[in-house]
Amino acid sequence: QGEHMFGNMWHGAFTCEPDLKYCNYLLVLGRNPMSSGGVAENYQYANALARGMKMIVVDPRLSPTGAKGNQWIPIKPGTDSAFMLAMIQVILNEIGAWDEPFLLEKTNSPYLVGPDGYFLRDEDGKVLAWDKLSKQAVPVDNSNPEQPKRLALLGEFTYKKTSCKTSFQMLKDHVKQYTPEWAESVTEIKANTIREVAKDWIEYAQIGATIELDGQVFPLRPVATKLGRGITGVMRSYQTILANHILAMIVGSIEVPGGHWGGIIESRGHFRGLIP
């Protein structure tokens, strides 16, 4: 199942869960937690809805969860990836909003990608990014907390006569084909509805907001998704859940209050840590 693969790769956990205590906008796809979840889960959902969390349910049928949500959006079965790809297109190329500090500091978005689709590397095998101040490709130094501020998130550059783009630029360019109009022909969800959900996703994410918990300040990104068997049990679930995590990544809603967390069943750490 795609969820378990991404749970391990992104969260070090077997499953992924929304932080219902602080989440203000929840997208539920392929799951019916209000009747198929456990007692504790139902209690958390009830409390979240009672305090004002907005819940949008994308499901082919009007489930009990859809009936309790703020909006039910019927979708053609197995087309959730098209819906989320269109949301990404709207956010990146129509609205033009994202959490730049998170993307620069926590993801490979500034890494340079060559014509062959692989990250560019120097003679020592280190991944390269573009330094905006020196205007040249430099090795990524994860030990330097100041470096991300200097790196280009978007752009096309030349390194040793090789044309390259940042990883985030390639994502932004790639999703241009996934317009809401295209997604409407696939999912049967109106293009305007997709745009409205994408706009809400950005607005509720509160990019730049923080929250203090137990004397420590954390980023606050109160938007999340909840996926279920209706997503993971169909063809291409890996790509669907990749699109889901990209949605969270764009706004920095990963492992922060209000956002997308690893579940209570922990794995053995990040998979790269297991490689000798």
Indicate residue ranges for each PLM-predicted region.
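Short, polar loop motifs at secondary-structure junctions
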Residues: 58-64
